[in-house]
Structure formats: C-alpha cells, structure tokens
Amino acid sequence: MDAQKDVQPPKQQPMIYICGECHTENEIKSRDPIRCRECGYRIMYKKRTKRLVVFDAR
C-alpha cells in the first residue's frame, strides 16, 4: 500500500506527449496549452503505454 501513496491522482498527473515535428517528449497537464515547448508545433501524439494491453477477439 505504501507504493501507491507516491502515485498522484490522474487529474494532477501530467501526460507525456511527443511532438509531431521535432519528436521531443513534453509533459502536458490538463490545463496546459497543447503546444511543443521546443518548437511550438501544435500536433502532439500521446506516448504509448508500457503496460500490457490485451484485446479479446470475439
């Protein structure tokens, strides 16, 4: 249980996005403008999760 205390709630935790132009990683919070901090480009891609994602075929 102590390990979960270090994790911030999802609303406050910044997401990591990758710039579509210069490919740098940017941490963007919920109220931050969607813009690269290096080049100012506005198209950002969400970084792929490292957690296992499984889809069931039906």
From Swiss-Prot:
Annotated compartments: Nucleus; Nucleus, Nucleolus
Physiological role: DNA-dependent RNA polymerase catalyzes the transcription of DNA into RNA using the four ribonucleoside triphosphates as substrates. Common component of RNA polymerases I, II and III which synthesize ribosomal RNA precursors, mRNA precursors and many functional non-coding RNAs, and a small RNAs, such as 5S rRNA and tRNAs, respectively.
Quaternary structure, from the entry: Component of the RNA polymerase I (Pol I), RNA polymerase II (Pol II) and RNA polymerase III (Pol III) complexes consisting of at least 13, 12 and 17 subunits, respectively. Pol I complex consists of a ten-subunit catalytic core composed of POLR1A/RPA1, POLR1B/RPA2, POLR1C/RPAC1, POLR1D/RPAC2, POLR1H/RPA12, POLR2E/RPABC1, POLR2F/RPABC2, POLR2H/RPABC3, POLR2K/RPABC4 and POLR2L/RPABC5; a mobile stalk subunit POLR1F/RPA43 protruding from the core and additional subunits homologous to general transcription factors POLR1E/RPA49 and POLR1G/RPA34.
Disulfide bond residue pairs: none
Gene3D superfamilies in the record: RNA polymerase ii, chain L
Stated family: Belongs to the archaeal Rpo12/eukaryotic RPC10 RNA polymerase subunit family.
Cellular component terms per the entry's GO annotation: nucleolus; nucleoplasm; nucleus; RNA polymerase II, core complex
Keyword Disulfide bond among UniProt keywords: no
Matching SMART domains: RPOLCX
Species for this entry: Mus musculus
Zinc fingers classed as C4-type: ranges: 19-39
Name of the protein described by the UniProt record: DNA-directed RNA polymerases I, II, and III subunit RPABC4
Binding site for Zn(2+): 19, 22, 36, 39
Molecular function terms, GO-annotated: DNA binding; DNA-directed RNA polymerase activity; zinc ion binding
